């Protein structure tokens, strides 16, 4: 599970904070390209950040409006 907070879009780039398992002590600030989904900063590239990016990508397919917060769960 990953929780995303402070989701903001600036042109072709989205930034957000990803929290592994919702743990505030396991925060990763991620900046990624909307078109390529490529991480643009030195964020940890792990299953949590990738899942967060994928979730935001799917939200954008449904609506042009991004939420300020989102979550993604998997088994």
Task: Walk through the language-model features, giving the residues of each.
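N-terminal start-of-chain detector that recognizes signal peptides
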Residues: 1-5, 43-46
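N-terminal acidic leader/helix
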Residues: 2-33
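Acidic, low-complexity intrinsically disordered segments
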Residues: 25-75
């Amino acid at each position: 599970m990953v929780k995303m907070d402070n989701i903001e879009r600036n042109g072709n780039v989205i930034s957000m904070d990803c929290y592994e398992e919702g743990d505030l002590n396991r925060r990763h600030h991620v900046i990624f390209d909307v078109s390529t989904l490529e991480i643009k900063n030195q964020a940890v590239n792990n299953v949590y950040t990738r899942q967060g990016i994928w979730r935001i990508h799917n939200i954008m397919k449904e609506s042009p409006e991004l939420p300020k917060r989102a979550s993604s769960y998997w088994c």
